Amino acid sequence: TKWNFEANGDAYAPIVDKIGNVYFVDKGGKSLYAVSKDGQLKWKFASESAPTYCFPVLDDKGNIYFGNGTGRIYAIDSSNGEELWHMDSEGTDNNAKIMSGMTIGDNQMLYVSYIGGNVAAIKIFAGPEKSTWSCRGGNIHGTNQY
């Protein structure tokens, strides 16, 4: 093992940038971590009080996006861990939870699925502006891990 980093809770969904930095969320600590390619903590961003299960995603400008169990979506600067913006999803606690991954399309849209059966498309470089649509059957969760 080259290095080992211990988070405050269950570590989920590591992603790696072009220079080898690793970013991951931890459920118990409700945080997003940045760890250097040699295993040293670069920064830690603590989200609100909800557990964080969502796979983060990195855009071509170096911004990281992730969500938590309340449906809040964060945009974080990967160089320093500072919050760029956040937005709250619409809906009740049950159908607004973000329990899976996100993806970024070629059109610079962030696509997010919610446990209540909705998928949102959010313009990420112009600030949060979204359109939402429902999926028959509901409960879109675990798309990247189940």
Predicted regions and their residues:
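Extracytoplasmic/lumenal domain signature
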Residues: 1-146
